[in-house]
Amino acid sequence: MSILSLVGLGISKKFITENAIDTLNNSDIIIFDKYTSRSCDINVDVLRRLVKGGKTLIEADRSLLENNSKIIMDYLDKNYNVSIASIGDVLIATTHVSLLIEAKQRGHNVKVIPGISVHCYLISKSLLSSYKFGKSVTVTFPYNDFIDPTPYNVIKDNKERGLHTILYLDLKSEKAMTANEALQILLRLEDKHRKNVLSKSDIVIVGARLGCDDEKIVALTVEEATLYDFGNTPHIIIIPGNLHYMEADAIKWMLMS
């Protein structure tokens, strides 16, 4: 029986675990998930340097991992050990669990190597209570004139319950959405729906290039954030809900310039 391993790489090179590296080195084929998330410094070249020679390394897009699992299963059926390596944690904000199930149904062994995800890292760095986060959501690029209202509605639902919202930002091919673009999209949704979900004076927390030496985590108003230079992507946003006084003090003294 072959082994299918799902390997979380963490959010940057310094968070890649020995367990992750050992698992990759014990694989014949490594499939690098390049579409689910993006790191400030992990890419396919970094993976090549991390693992021993002789490995087949494949860069995978959404089509391979979500629509062409037969390719992966064929490798396993031919007794190749396969690892799927993802930025962050391999099962947070992914659909890869379906691959584990399919491999197990075919009689193969499966293994999961967790990694430090941007979700957990951001919550810690934001100084907000982990108990007060609601559903997370992705802000997507507009398609023609259509703007998906899902993030607006999720923020609304979370705020009604006093909960914070983490906003993941869209990736399209090689373009990553910036925090500035995401907030401008949300303001356009507010102008359209007018449910008082977001105003220019609201405080938001923005993370940029988390896990790298040049990371930024700042709290500022929506209006300020639309103009702020957060530097290179990836970016991520928290829309706070009701703040406990300790959370408010932490934002004021630790995150606001």
UniProtKB/Swiss-Prot annotation:
Transmembrane segments: none annotated. SUPFAM superfamilies: Tetrapyrrole methylase. GO terms for molecular function: diphthine synthase activity. The keyword GTP-binding does not apply. Pathway: Protein modification; peptidyl-diphthamide biosynthesis. The keyword Iron does not apply. It is an enzyme of class 2 (transferase). Its EC number is 2.1.1.98. It catalyses: 2-[(3S)-amino-3-carboxypropyl]-L-histidyl-[translation elongation factor 2] + 3 S-adenosyl-L-methionine = diphthine-[translation elongation factor 2] + 3 S-adenosyl-L-homocysteine + 3 H(+). Gene3D superfamilies: Cobalt-precorrin-4 Transmethylase, Domain 1, Methyltransferase, Cobalt-precorrin-4 Transmethylase, Domain 2. S-adenosyl-L-methionine binds at I11, D89, I92, S117, V118, L169, L210, H235. InterPro entries: 4pyrrol_Mease, 4pyrrol_Methylase_sf, 4pyrrole_Mease_sub1, 4pyrrole_Mease_sub2, Dphthn_synthase. Keywords: Methyltransferase, S-adenosyl-L-methionine, Transferase. One of its GO terms (biological process) is protein histidyl modification to diphthamide. S-adenosyl-L-methionine-dependent methyltransferase that catalyzes the trimethylation of the amino group of the modified target histidine residue in translation elongation factor 2 (EF-2), to form an intermediate called diphthine. The three successive methylation reactions represent the second step of diphthamide biosynthesis. Belongs to the diphthine synthase family. Homodimer. NCBIfam families: dph5 (TIGR00522). HAMAP family: Diphthine_synth. This is Diphthine synthase. It comes from Saccharolobus islandicus (strain L.S.2.15 / Lassen #1). The gene is dphB.
